[in-house]
Swiss-Prot record:
The keyword RNA-binding does not apply. Keywords: Aromatic hydrocarbons catabolism, Dioxygenase, NAD, Oxidoreductase. GO terms for biological process: 3-phenylpropionate catabolic process. Coiled coil: none annotated. The gene is hcaF. Its EC number is 1.14.12.19. This is 3-phenylpropionate/cinnamic acid dioxygenase subunit beta. Pathway: Aromatic compound metabolism; 3-phenylpropanoate degradation.
Length: 172
């Protein structure tokens, strides 16, 4: 296991993640994009249910990408949301990103830190459409020379194997 970080560094990285979540909840997508590293990897795979005997053998069923985005692709997703023509987001969703169990450790790369958080993402739209997404995120954050932070990687793992939402237009 990699070395854990100091309490001060843990607080700084946690505050960066909380700020990033509030930008998404407030629909400040351009400000959120500014928090992303140019080399961002933003991924989510399908979740599959593996049999216990297969998991014991280390056998994992194949999965499919839901997201495998670069910064350019994320910019295009946001540009589409801004047009008012993204019908899945008319009227716009109200979201709340809750982050907990934040575990942060050093990596082999200087100024890059591995972060594991549990999340609950609540999405409400129209009068009765509500969706909860629950899972774990594996992030990598980079500390810049000016002591600011950038999100370098985000791997989103959903606990649910079946997504019951009408769309998957939210950002995690």
């Amino acid at each position: 296991m990699s070395a854990q970080v100091s309490l001060e560094l843990h607080l700084r990285i946690s505050q960066f993640l909380f700020h990033e979540a509030s930008l998404l909840d407030d629909w400040k997508f351009r400000d959120w994009l500014a928090q992303l590293d140019e080399e961002i990897r933003y991924t989510m795979r399908t979740t599959v249910n593996a049999q216990t005997r297969d998991r014991r053998k280390g056998v994992q069923p194949p999965t499919t990408w839901i997201f495998n985005d670069t910064k350019d692709q994320l910019e295009r997703r946001i540009a589409r949301l801004e047009t008012g023509m993204a019908w899945a987001e008319e009227p716009p969703s109200r979201t709340r990103h809750l982050i907990s169990n934040c575990q942060i450790s050093e990596t082999d790369i200087p100024n890059v830190f591995a972060v594991r958080v549990n999340y609950l993402l609540y999405q409400a739209q129209k009068e009765r459409d509500e969706t909860f997404y629950v899972g774990t995120r594996f992030d990598k954050v980079r500390r810049l020379e000016d002591d600011n932070w950038r999100l370098l990687e985000r791997d989103i793992v959903l606990d649910q194997a079946v997504i019951t939402s009408h769309n998957l237009s939210v950002l995690f």
